[in-house]
Structure formats: structure tokens, C-alpha cells
Amino acid sequence: MNAGTRRFTVDGPAGAIEVAVDEPAGPVRGVALVLHPLPTHGGTMDNKVVQTLARASVALGLRAVRFNFRGVGASAGAFDGGPGETDDAAAVAAAVRDPHWPFALAGFSFGAFVATQLAARLAQSGHPADHLALVGLAASRFPATQVPASTLVVHGETDDVVPLAAVLDWARPQAMPVTVVPGAGHYFHGQLPLLKTLLTRAWAPAFPSLSE
């Protein structure tokens, strides 16, 4: 993401997982794990939406962690359709999470679906994520679970990969608000600064000393 990005591997259930970490300029105030879109459609941790979410996290004083799902980049294994990728995310979360810091979770498209699965798993274990953001959730393609009421859900009005209607159908039974970006497609072309602002605004109250 920048010259200071630190790259290493974490042991995962399918082998080595390629990880990238970006640090804030000041004191670390938490950890944000950002999950990338569908591997079979070219999704990687260097996707521009993923990097935007990571930059927003860093701006709030969070250590931003990205990684490649199994079979992507230098990560071992092969695409598993969701369950294996959730296991990958859980392995990275366990490796980078610090019990003394807030833990935030964000995902884009397929990564947002995996984020719902990981969030449910963490909650069941008694160690839920403190913040959750879902961008372009692939609700029409994968069975996303219910999420906490505090979750930020962002979708493009003209998304032709995952129709807005599919996300509204998922959100409706939960009475979950959805932030719709007018005119934005799935990849938020020309709207990435706004996307960064939306995440920063949603999470800023938890980090007031860095966001005021």
C-alpha cells in the first residue's frame, strides 16, 4: 500500500498465508483486518477498495492488516468457496489481534461475506469484533449471516455485480440500515474518497483523540 508496508506470512489451515500490515503514524489504537473480494474474479489484498478501507483504518490510528486468501498471491491452498477462507481469516485474526486493543473487521464483496462469517464465529467464541464494516456485500451470491446492529453497510446504487436489491433483501429482516452511494458501481470508481470518509466517520467516535 505504501513504502512502509510490512509483509510476512502466517501459518494457516491450508499452509502459509501472505499478510501485509500498515502502521499508523502515531500510537497504535487498535487493529483492523480487511478482507478482499472474490479470488476467482481476480480479487487480492491489493484491490483498490481494500486498500481504501485499510487507509481509512490507518488514518484512525489502527494497524491495518490485509492478507491473501488461500490460492491467491503467495498464499498456499486453493479457493474453497467461503468456509476455508473464513478459516484463513480466523487464523490471521488470531495472529494479529491484541487483547488490549479494539479489533475492527472490514470486507469488500466476497470479503464482506467472509467478514460476516468470521464475525459470527468470533462472537460465538466470546471475543466479538468491536467494529464491523461491509462494503459491496455479495449477498446475492453467498449466504451472509446476520450482523450486529452497529455494523456499517455500504453499497453502490448502480452495482451490476451485486444488485442493491439483494443487499436490501438481506438487510430488511434485521432492520439494518444500508448506506447507498448514489451512482456508484460495485468497485466505487470515482467514489473511493467518499468511501474512505464513510468508514472514518462511522468508526471515528471510538477513536476521538485521533479523529477530532
Model-derived features: positions:
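Alpha/beta-hydrolase active-site loop
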Residues: 79-98
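Gly/Ala-rich beta-loop-alpha elbow adjacent to hydrolase catalytic centers
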Residues: 107-115
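Short beta-strand/loop motif that positions the catalytic acidic residue
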Residues: 147, 152-155, 159
